[in-house]
């Protein structure tokens, strides 16, 4: 009986030392998540998690070219336009390329709405094509937004190379006339 009492006392002492100390409560850090959408409010370039270039009318007018393709080739490093050989109607259509990908992988928007593709489908022998950017006059542009990263999750498979959004001037009256020499 004495042994049982002694062993119970020893067990109580050991169990008392094995009690975990009470730790102060640690504040849980909450990770900030940015959610963006097509119909959300406009955001500035510095708030964007992806590479977005925004060119205002001053930047567009400062380039010495008047063709929209040439203006974008000057301002956007990953923008390219290739001329087709003189053999058929493909000579007259110059769709945009971003990041060296095919022309149908660059989404072109005008005032945030999809631009229709060119009617000629045989460009470069691939059977696919993108919109002809040369049909958008540079004098009608208010600004150009270029997303130089894949946006297929947001816009679909035609935005794998990136997205170009042309914002047109919203003048309801009047017009403009410019001469470059």
What are these regions (language model features)?
Residues 113-148:
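Short acidic/polar hinge/loop motifs at secondary-structure boundaries
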Residues 32-63, 69, 90, 119-125, ...:
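N-terminal periplasmic "start-of-domain" segments of outer-membrane beta-barrel proteins
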């Amino acid at each position: 009986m004495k042994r049982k009492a002694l062993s119970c006392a020893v067990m109580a002492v050991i169990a008392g030392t094995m009690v975990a100390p009470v730790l102060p409560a640690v504040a849980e850090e909450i990770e900030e998540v940015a959610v963006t959408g097509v119909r959300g409010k406009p955001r500035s370039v510095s708030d964007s998690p992806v590479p977005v270039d925004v060119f205002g009318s001053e930047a567009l007018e400062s380039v010495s070219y008047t063709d929209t393709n040439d203006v974008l080739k000057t301002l956007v490093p990953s923008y390219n336009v290739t001329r087709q050989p003189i053999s058929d109607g493909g000579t007259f259509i110059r769709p945009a390329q971003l990041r060296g990908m095919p022309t149908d992988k660059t989404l072109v928007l005008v005032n945030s709405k999809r631009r229709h593709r060119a009617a000629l489908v045989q460009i470069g022998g691939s059977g696919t094509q993108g919109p002809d950017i040369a049909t958008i006059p540079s004098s009608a542009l208010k600004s150009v937004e270029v997303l130089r990263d894949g946006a297929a999750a947001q816009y679909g498979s035609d935005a794998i190379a990136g997205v170009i959004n042309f914002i047109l001037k919203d003048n309801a009256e009047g017009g403009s006339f410019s001469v470059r020499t």
